[in-house]
Amino acid sequence: KGVLDRAEFEARNDQFFADYKAGTLNIDEFLDFQLRPLRDNKRTQLAIWHNQFMAEVIRPNMKPSAIELVKHHQADNAVCVIITATNSFITQPIAQAFGIEALIATEPELVNGEYTGKVTGVPSFREGKVTRLNDWLAAKNWTLSSFESSHFYSDSINDLPLLECVSHPVAANPDHKLAEIAQTRGWPVLELFK
């Protein structure tokens, strides 16, 4: 939309993604980069752009296999939660599109109704996902052991701390490092996007 220098943005984003896949992402540097456009634009404009993003990019790429997986868990009366390092501005509408009410995401700070470019609370990344999940469960007077089983699907080695906490870890479209761990530990591997 001409708000960012496309070449610079893509180069930095590609480097952050490579670091993420390698398990070496500096979350603070990434969040400073990721949240800057929220800080630099009014929420009304951001909402317009996000609606376009949902219509043009997200909804056309929502794979039936992923939608069916969510529906399967919901049919079993599972409490479905999306837990993501991506900020809630981006992910809340995506969670809603999948019919999932509960979202644990990195929370961008709001002051006087506008984004500051900073984070509120613990980023939902690596061990932070475990912390944020435990806080969310505690607010409902639950723990993971309150449930007969717990499932977590991930594509990233960065999610190993949470995968190790649940009764049913699943590597979904895993990166190379996670695929190796899943094979070693006998975890199921799903290819949801083929």
State where each predicted segment sits:
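A metal-dependent, Asp-based hydrolase signature
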Residues: 1-72
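C-terminal cap/substrate-recognition subdomain and adjoining C-terminal extension
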Residues: 48-51, 55-194
